[in-house]
Amino acid sequence: MASYPGPGKSKAKYPFKKRAGLQASAAAPEARSGLGASPLQSARSLPGNAPCLKHFPLDLRTSMDGKCKEIAEELFSRSLAESELRSAPYEFPEESPIEQLEERRQRLERQISQDVKLEPDILLRAKQDFLKTDSDSDLQLYKEQGEGQGDRGLWERDVVLEREFQRVIISGEEKCGVPFTDLLDAAKSVVRALFIREKYMALSLQSFCPTTRRYLQQLAEKPLETRTYEQSPDTPVSADAPVHPPALEQHPYEHCEPSAMPGDLGLGLRMVRGVVHVYTRRDPDEHCPEVELPYPDLQEFVADVNVLMALIINGPIKSFCYRRLQYLSSKFQMHVLLNEMKELAAQKKVPHRDFYNIRKVDTHIHASSCMNQKHLLRFIKRAMKRHLEEIVHVEQGREQTLREVFESMNLTAYDLSVDTLDVHADRNTFHRFDKFNAKYNPIGESVLREIFIKTDNKISGKYFAHIIKEVMADLEESKYQNAELRLSIYGRSRDEWDKLARWAVNHKVHSPNVRWLVQVPRLFDVYRTKGQLANFQEMLENIFLPLFEATVHPASHPELHLFLEHVDGFDSVDDESKPENHVFNLESPLPEAWVEEDNPPYAYYLYYTFANMAMLNHLRRQRGFHTFVLRPHCGEAGPIHHLVSAFMLAENISHGLLLRKAPVLQYLYYLAQIGIAMSPLSNNSLFLSYHRNPLPEYLSRGLMVSLSTDDPLQFHFTKEPLMEEYSIATQVWKLSSCDMCELARNSVLMSGFSHKVKSHWLGPNYTKEGPEGNDIRRTNVPDIRVGYRYETLCQELALITQAVQSEMLETIPEEVGIVMSPGP
């Protein structure tokens, strides 16, 4: 059995050309206090230079390579033409659909079965010409593994686990069910797509599935670098450590004095072509050397998008991925039939651990709607009783008290009810995102939204801070429920970040059960129409320059520096179903030239968010600060290329509904184990009926999915919306206890909580692959389930990587048997 390098054993280089690392100017003596052993030095470069990402570790050319640009342009133009239609633009013409391929294969097999009675040689010729899956060109590695290994099981290193549950092993030839030429072409395309994602994740210091990386290492000319994305705790967590992390000794927003902040690097900042560049002097001129930080090259990004767009509509590749997904679904059903009782028995053996007593993270929830409607109603009534004379609003230059605001609406506390509040989504919001957005206004009045659920208002967000702290108190009381709340930055002015940070610090809005994500609504067209922005680059400057300033000189933004340590990353939000009038390509205007009132396309927002985040992450990593990830809303509606952009650039996504109609992308998301936070109740009110939601299908196939609430104010009724989400899903889809605990474990793995916190919640070995990384005493997920997921993923990765390797190996005699079960 072949051996594979374990995670963390190889120390190697990036698979792309890396720009020079962070260096400091000798003219900036302050830098020494910030970077310690990694001083900054000047390095001459031109603004806009980027690392070369064009070199794959091996030859992955396919038959589509010369046509990628033309295919992608055709798809993008079709997307624009069909944006008015409800049908999605990824439903392509019937040039090579799966049904035709299936019918053709069945006809051939029927013909073979009829002719073999008359002429046995026909069968042999047919196998050689059409079903030549595992013969001449098959894998030398299979040959080495095949003899004597198939009957002994898959995993020699874990004999105990092997005896614990039953497996289904597919042996013999033609296991993937497609012609070998199609298998080879599909495998090369899939591997190429995975390499594309790996290089962008490495470029931005985001995480990449270690199991997938380990298999890609077999194909790389040089081993891929294994990176640690979270700072390890000073003291490792022991195996017997308590499930609850130790309480903080002091509030994290204490010591906000500038004198207590890290030193000033004395670097200059300027945005060039939509990306912030860092210079060695505070006021850079044309000849000032630049501190070189890596960011993606625009030309290569567009080329990579074209490759993936061409890949997802290739007929043979669609057939291959569709078959693999169907196989994964069937295999899971067989696993459940064989091992369900063993999984349940393993859970029952664990003392004081059940679904209620394991950590769950709401990985997709908006802060402005994190409370339920009854909670908001009670808070408004309480405010009307206690703060009736407080000045809360300014209307046309005149200050108004809370009493005057409600008198202008002809309302009293007695008149208010849940029905009057009218914030809950109903049947009228289905496919009407505009009506859904209106539900954010209590009683249909935007002034109440501004007073009660905004951070920037006349009272500096006092009411909103109080209600958020009440939600946090409920989470802390439950002990095992956590949330990642989204706060908004719009990019209309440079001081938005400081106002948001002051709101959090001054009101001490913090909880060990809560992390923050910052969402950026894609509303440039609205701001441009109102004359609030001159061009798109101004919006990018308002979003990212304060973050770079707080990193270079934390004392200049003390509250922001403290706040950013509790921010996980960035989210991109808006109605994805809105038509896009532009295609992002090399002819698209640069951000400083985007002055029209049309909104840039989704990929445009995502690319420039990613590029600036990548630069910022490298700067912050050198200073020892917390880094960020990209976790956008994606795949809820709209065109398929949203999911293509997210596959390349995002660590996790929210929604992902459209993957159900894109088998190639769904298979890629599975192989890369990209987290998908799904909200079935939210989707049920907006885009997709509950019974049609693909979550149970994704879960059975092994995609990294979790349950989330999205907007409890609009969609939920109880005090514990996350438990409500789990309970409804369990009842409707008949999920088992193991399924529910697996979803909860996935939510913790996907979340942005620190490595130390996750070590307490999941166990100190949670970063290890397979059952070794599972602690059933903390997760209540049986090793049987984790082992099944791990083995299945390894087998799928082995199928595609070994098919690619087969081209580089000598011909294998046809009579040699083949076993497709590599060791870990």
Swiss-Prot record:
GO cellular component: cytosol
Organism phylogeny: Eukaryota, Metazoa, Chordata, Craniata, Vertebrata
Organism: Mus musculus
Encoding gene (name): Ampd2
Assigned protein family: Belongs to the metallo-dependent hydrolases superfamily. Adenosine and AMP deaminases family.
Disruption phenotype: Mice have normal brain histology.
Cited Pfam families: AMP_deaminase
Enzyme class: hydrolase
PANTHER family in the record: AMP DEAMINASE, AMP DEAMINASE 2
Listed GO biological process terms: AMP metabolic process; ATP metabolic process; cholesterol homeostasis; cyclic purine nucleotide metabolic process; energy homeostasis; GMP salvage; GTP metabolic process; IMP biosynthetic process
Residue stretches of biased makeup (Basic residues): 10-20
Gene Ontology MF term list: AMP deaminase activity; metal ion binding
Entry EC number(s): 3.5.4.6
Annotated binding of substrate, by residue: H366, K435, F436, N437, A438, K439, Y440, E636, D711, P712, L713, Q714
PTM annotation (Omega-N-methylarginine): residues: R44
Positions bearing Phosphoserine: S45, S63, S79, S96, S113, S135, S137
Active site: H655 (proton acceptor)
Cofactors required: Zn(2+)
Textual note on the cofactor: Binds 1 zinc ion per subunit.
Keyword Zinc in record: yes
Residues annotated as transmembrane: none
Subunit annotation: Homotetramer.
Cited function: AMP deaminase plays a critical role in energy metabolism. Catalyzes the deamination of AMP to IMP and plays an important role in the purine nucleotide cycle.
Disulphide bridges: none
SUPFAM superfamilies named in the record: Metallo-dependent hydrolases
Enzymatic reactions: AMP + H2O + H(+) = IMP + NH4(+)
Identification of the protein by name: AMP deaminase 2
